[in-house]
């Protein structure tokens, strides 16, 4: 049977696009994929970012509120409509709590209460946490996308990782949506196919205050992997500015709240 895997992109809650995320969760409830995987940066943790260090943002005291927003905006609504497997991958933004403790309060290292799975209640929501790239499908690794250099072209960062690792790669981090691939053949016979698949983002662009003039070559969306035995077919899903998107010939998406 054909397995359908939904791959969610960077949300960076609380800087997520509320309408887009609600639309994707609504789609998941109707589509009922076999598995859900997220490429990382589900939360942002700006209070403990190195960019915030020593500024007013570090002293806001709203870290718990941001953690609660993750549950309220994503995990709780998702679990109301979907009971299947959910997997999260480590990422640079989700590394921030560990990095902050390691560099500012090393005496607290190893305290599970300060680790991301505890901060965001992964056990309560049935979320499996991965600290390394992992095999999501035959011949495919899921990674965050910050494990190598960045490409300006959508799919290029993932393909570079694929060349380095010898697997096809699906990742996030770049906020770009697209596929690059290279196939090899000899004597008219395909000997290897390798894909680099980047799944876009679910951020609210206006929340990225660090962008000059609000400009970025980013694409909102997510991904689907269709798995049939050892054959994997990647499919990017573009989210239009009005929040709608098309999967398998059917339009999904919710109007603005």
PLM ranges: what are they?
Residues 1-6, 134-141:
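Beta-strand-turn-beta hairpins that frame and shape the catalytic cleft
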Residues 2-7, 30-31, 237-255:
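Polar, enzyme-active/binding microenvironments
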Residues 3, 32-34, 83-85, 138, ...:
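Short coil/turn segments at beta-strand junctions that form active-site/ligand-binding loops
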Residues 6-8, 37, 87, 140, ...:
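Hydrophobic "anchor" residues on beta-strands that sit immediately upstream
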Residues 8, 13-123:
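Core catalytic region of metal-dependent phosphoesterases/phosphodiesterases
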Residues 85-93, 128-132, 235-239:
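Acidic carboxylate-rich catalytic motifs and surrounding loops in phosphoryl-/glycosyl-chemistry enzymes
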Residues 119-138:
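Short acidic low-complexity segments
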Residues 139-237, 242:
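Conserved beta-sheet core of the metallophosphoesterase superfamily
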């Amino acid at each position: 049977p054909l397995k359908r895997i939904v791959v969610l992109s960077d949300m960076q809650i609380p800087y997520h696009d509320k309408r887009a995320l609600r639309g994707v969760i609504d789609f998941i409830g109707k589509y009922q994929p076999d598995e859900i995987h997220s490429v990382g940066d589900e939360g942002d943790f700006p209070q403990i970012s190195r960019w915030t260090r020593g500024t007013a943002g570090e002293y806001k005291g709203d870290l718990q509120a941001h953690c609660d927003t993750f549950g309220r905006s994503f995990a709780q609504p998702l679990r109301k409509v979907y009971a299947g497997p959910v997997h999260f991958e480590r990422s640079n933004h989700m590394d921030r709590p560990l990095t902050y403790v390691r560099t500012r309060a090393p005496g607290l290292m190893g305290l599970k209460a300060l680790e991301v799975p505890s901060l965001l209640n992964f056990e309560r929501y049935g979320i499996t946490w991965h600290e390394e790239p992992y095999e999501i499908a035959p011949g495919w690794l899921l990674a965050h996308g910050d494990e190598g250099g960045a490409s300006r072209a959508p799919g290029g960062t993932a393909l570079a990782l694929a060349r380095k690792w010898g697997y096809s790669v699906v990742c996030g981090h770049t906020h770009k949506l697209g596929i690059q691939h290279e196939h090899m053949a000899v004597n008219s016979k395909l000997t290897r196919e390798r894909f680099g698949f980047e799944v876009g983002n679910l951020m609210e662009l206006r929340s990225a205050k660090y962008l000059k003039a609000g400009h970025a070559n980013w694409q909102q969306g997510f991904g689907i992997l269709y798995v049939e035995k050892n054959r994997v077919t990647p499919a990017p899903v573009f989210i239009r500015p009005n929040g709608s998107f098309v999967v398998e010939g059917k339009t999904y998406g919710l109007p603005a709240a």
